[in-house]
């Protein structure tokens, strides 16, 4: 499974390798399961109702309510539709992921089941709203967007915090309650950055995440700027989260998405709101990775790097 994890996300594999062993295993498995459900939800060559049914069935397998062999055949159909061989290999090996889940301690297993249940709920909503790519559909309200970012990403901050305090005695200088709140905001901020970054591509596929009620009363540039400001506020909560971690290795693994997110916000701020997809160049990601390794040694240095990356 290590080889599969490395193949589907080299950057995530690199950062996760820095985590202490008690955190590495449940985080790795949760990532693989979430990546698999995301792949199922996004397999456009399979009709949305079939994707929705299979996603729900697999969620029941994760929850321990259904045997894996009852959905092995539909999953093979999904695997066959993957153009990316690494995604295909992941789907083909989900039985091993479920076996791995069964071998974990009960607390970690229950937390993985809980966070995957929340993530799948968000993915189901996405399929129900945007299942037909020939029809352009928008989220209606800011509450719907806030809910979506929590379901598919904010909940991960809660999951990460529970694992940290359970396995690492001195996980953070803040209380579990404070860290949970910051962690949820961090996850929501990362997802909001993705939405703003991918807005043009999503619109071409019939998905509009910026609230229709806001677009009806303000120019798109203003709505975009407002949500970009919210993303910056949330990602700043993320760097507060990371700076509160007491172990530099955990700080490094946790902070990298915030640092790349900070640079993405700077690029989005400078771009036209209707521009094509904005992405931090690979060379720049490597520079951020190198800089974050040193900056993670000190919370102050980490904050300084973050401020430099997010600056206009």
Cite the ranges covered by each PLM segment:
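Catalytic cores of Mg2+-dependent Asp-rich isoprenoid enzymes
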Residues: 1-190, 196-312
């Amino acid at each position: 499974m290590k080889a599969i994890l490395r193949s589907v996300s080299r950057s995530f594999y690199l950062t996760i390798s820095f985590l202490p062993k008690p955190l590495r295993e449940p985080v790795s498995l949760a990532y693989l399961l979430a990546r698999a459900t995301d792949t199922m939800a996004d397999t456009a060559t399979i009709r949305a109702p079939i994707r929705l049914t299979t996603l729900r069935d697999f969620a029941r397998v994760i929850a321990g309510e259904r045997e894996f062999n009852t959905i092995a055949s539909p999953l093979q159909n999904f695997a066959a539709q993957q153009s990316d061989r690494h995604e295909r290999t992941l789907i083909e090996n989900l039985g091993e992921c479920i076996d791995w889940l069964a071998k974990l301690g009960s607390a970690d297993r229950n937390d993985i089941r809980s966070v995957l249940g929340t993530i799948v709920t968000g993915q189901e909503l996405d399929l129900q709203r945007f299942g037909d790519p020939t029809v352009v559909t928008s989220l209606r309200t800011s509450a719907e967007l806030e809910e979506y970012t929590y379901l598919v990403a904010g909940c991960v901050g809660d999951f990460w915090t529970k694992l940290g305090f359970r396995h690492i005695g001195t996980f953070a200088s803040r209380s579990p309650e404070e860290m949970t709140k910051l962690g949820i905001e961090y996850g929501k901020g990362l997802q909001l950055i993705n939405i703003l970054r991918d807005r043009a591509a999503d619109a071409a596929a019939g998905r509009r995440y910026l609230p229709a009620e806001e677009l009806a009363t303000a120019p798109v540039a203003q709505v975009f700027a407002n949500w970009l400001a919210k993303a910056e506020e949330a990602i700043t909560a993320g760097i507060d989260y990371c700076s509160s971690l007491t172990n530099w290795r955990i700080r490094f693994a946790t902070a990298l998405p915030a640092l790349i997110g900070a640079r993405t916000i700077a690029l989005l701020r400078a771009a036209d709101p209707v521009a094509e997809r904005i992405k931090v160049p690979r060379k720049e990601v490597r520079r951020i990775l190198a800089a974050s390794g040193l900056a993670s040694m000190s919370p102050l240095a980490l904050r300084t790097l973050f401020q430099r990356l997010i600056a206009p």
